[in-house]
């Protein structure tokens, strides 16, 4: 567990996804809680199903906010930056 709070750096795509999540009426507080947990360097709960991604998203991680609402992120350890890459449904993010 990290002792230093990470700097949160949302991508342009994440900012658009965030606005779409609000428009869809999703409980944005759930997303913000997960982001805060990650930024504090704490471990997510098992129900968030946090795991590494492969393929085009290699080097990133994914966690579940809700069963079909995901957050793709990356922690850049040397500079302690939490990069928020995307958020949305499985089909939004992976076309499935």
Model-based region annotation:
Residues 1-67, 76-83, 87, 91-96:
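Basic, Lys/Arg-enriched alpha-helical interface segments
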